[in-house]
């Protein structure tokens, strides 16, 4: 993209709540940063965390400390967002009201979630845990759900590792131990002590993050146990290399488990927080990982076989292409963000003629016959002079993308629209309907009712009207087999 669309990532992280939301948001920023301007908004980050954010993002917005139950919390991004900005939220305090505040600015909104704790009005929701049913979520009609590890948020080294062959590391049998960036309950030390009794492990690589608060206690214990090595604040590259050297890992049921599974190896997981329950269940029930309690039995049964079986299963879920899938989603969202409406003119004659005669358009029209240029010319000139007709061209990045027309009579507008072939399949239908209606209301604020007729087999348009907030009305007697969609003033304003 020449003019990169701005994405504002909003997440918090510290020693109390951990760094999980920040880390996975940064993984997404790493995927998108070359095509988008990525800016991170956060409350009270430590100096170390600020430096980490700057490595992955183009800028950092340090927000004033504000509790989520304060009235001003839902407006904390107001000064930074407009309809040409994408917003990514990752955290449990970004409730429906917070999201609505962003949507009222006209922004495209993307939420990263794993607890489905409230109604979402986001344009897309990502839950990378496997086995999550769409029915768990209460969403707006237009919300797109991205569920499971095919959309996993991995940093670049782990995406590359997922594509590479993985074999059992040679030399001393090493274990990777990481229970999260903060680990407030100090599971790290508890597990490290327990591993002294496990036979067959020659080295233990212990990793903690910048928010870990128990470092002196851990260092004191490790000083007397030489097979343990301590690492802190590793980069993604360093973390990946360390994982590749370890045939075995113990992690929390969090993003780090997905990172190790993308590298490949014998993985054991521990649930260290309530919000890890669904991921813990998915990992252990599908053979991607085993429960921590099974570690001794599994190692005794034979490491080479267990390692190979684990990697084979993990490769079925992690193909290293989640960045490509997510890039496509964000490019479509950016396209929707940039949609503008202008009035059609006589200069659009041939453009509208070509669009109208597109085979796909004719197939879904109530009159499927080809349109002649002479009759099209008369029609356009008549409509442009008609005070009760409004014709708009939707443009994306300055390029004509769609046409939307309204026929107005007695406070009611009948809508008709089409999308150019190069812009189909990008999820733009509902955006064009919404922006077209908004443009019409600016010019005709007295409007009371909008309706549209859609052929039953035209599922793309049916879905677009549903996502745009239209409801099903009584069928039109002239076209009883068609869906009749309607939108009332209270739904519009």
Residue ranges and their predicted role:
Residues 257-300:
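Catalytic binding pocket for nucleotide-activated donors in carbohydrate/polymer assembly enzymes
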Residues 308-320:
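A short, well-ordered alpha-helix in the C-terminal region of glycosyltransferases
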């Amino acid at each position: 993209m020449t003019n990169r669309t701005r994405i504002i990532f909003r997440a918090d992280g510290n020693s109390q709540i951990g760094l999980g939301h920040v880390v996975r948001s940064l993984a997404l920023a790493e995927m998108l940063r070359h095509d988008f301007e990525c800016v991170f908004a956060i409350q009270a980050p430590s100096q170390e965390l600020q430096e980490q954010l700057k490595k992955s993002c183009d800028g950092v917005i340090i927000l004033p400390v504000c509790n989520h139950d304060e009235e001003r919390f839902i407006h904390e991004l107001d000064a930074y967002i407009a309809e040409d900005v994408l917003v990514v939220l990752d955290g449990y305090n970004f409730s429906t009201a917070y999201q609505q505040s962003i949507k009222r600015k006209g922004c495209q909104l993307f939420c990263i979630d794993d607890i489905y704790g409230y109604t979402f009005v986001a344009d897309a929701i990502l839950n990378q845990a496997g086995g999550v049913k769409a029915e768990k979520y209460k969403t707006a009609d237009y919300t797109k759900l991205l569920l499971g590890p095919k959309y996993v948020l991995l940093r670049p080294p782990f995406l590359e590792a997922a594509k590479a062959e993985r074999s059992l590391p040679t030399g001393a049998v090493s274990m990777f131990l990481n229970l999260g960036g903060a680990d407030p309950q100090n599971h790290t030390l508890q597990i490290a002590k327990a591993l002294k009794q496990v036979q067959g492990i020659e080295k233990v690589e212990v990793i903690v993050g910048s928010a870990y608060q128990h470092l002196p206690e851990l260092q004191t214990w490790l000083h007397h146990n030489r097979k343990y090595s301590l690492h802190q604040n590793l980069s993604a590259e360093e973390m990946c290399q360390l994982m590749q050297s370890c045939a075995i890992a113990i992690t929390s049921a969090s993003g780090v488990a997905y990172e190790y599974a993308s590298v490949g190896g014998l993985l054991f997981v521990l649930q260290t927080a309530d919000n890890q329950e669904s991921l813990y269940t998915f990992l252990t029930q599908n053979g991607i990982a085993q429960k921590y309690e099974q570690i001794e039995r599994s190692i005794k049964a034979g490491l080479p076989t267990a390692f190979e079986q684990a990697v084979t299963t993990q490769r079925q879920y992690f193909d290293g292409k989640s960045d490509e899938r997510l890039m496509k989603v964000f490019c479509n969202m950016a396209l929707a963000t940039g949609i503008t409406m202008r009035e059609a003119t006589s200069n659009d004659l041939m453009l509208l003629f070509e669009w109208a005669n597109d085979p796909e358009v004719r197939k879904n029209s109530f009159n499927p016959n080809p349109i002649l240029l002479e009759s099209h010319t008369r029609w356009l000139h008549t409509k442009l002079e008609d005070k009760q007709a409004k014709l708009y061209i939707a443009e994306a990045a300055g390029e004509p993308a769609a046409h939307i027309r309204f026929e107005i009579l007695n406070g009611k507008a009948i809508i008709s629209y089409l999308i150019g072939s190069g812009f189909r399949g990008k999820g733009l239908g509902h955006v064009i309907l919404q922006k077209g209606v908004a443009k019409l209301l600016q010019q005709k604020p007295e409007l009371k009712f909008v309706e549209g007729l859609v052929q039953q087999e035209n599922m793309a348009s049916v879905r677009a009207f549903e996502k745009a907030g239209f409801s099903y009305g009584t069928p039109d007697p002239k076209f009883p087999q068609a869906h009749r969609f309607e939108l009332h003033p209270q739904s519009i304003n």
